[in-house]
């Protein structure tokens, strides 16, 4: 997330362009609620923050129930996140997701233990997460990494590597001649 943040409405336009179905994409709906709710945390206490908070909480619950996508406003999500297929996507409130990442259906970014409830994954830029993948704990996924379908990641993944299997094994890309 190295690029400057242009603001919630510019980010919404980027997110809409990034999803093939645009306004009809459930992934876009979830990101729209996130983009509109996250700036509320920076506001001072007051009636506007309270009313906006109630609206965004209701909208967030609607997205969770209707689309099966949970993106808490406390998570830090970079630009142009693409949610390829909706359903079963859970992101921990302390997670960090870099720019140009891709999440597929049934992905979990969560903590590993009740004793460390704030430990959450950090995804670098351009990370692709396959369907059904689970990334748990305070792990860092490097830039351009690929997490395979149904992989269970419990340790750091270096930049450009692939993590596949349960538990995930790390495979470095083969150098090209």
Q: Where are the language model's segments positioned?
A:
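Terminal amphipathic alpha-helical/low-complexity segments used for targeting or macromolecular assembly
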Residues: 1-67, 176-177
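Left-handed beta-helix
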Residues: 67, 72-73, 78-79, 84-93, ...
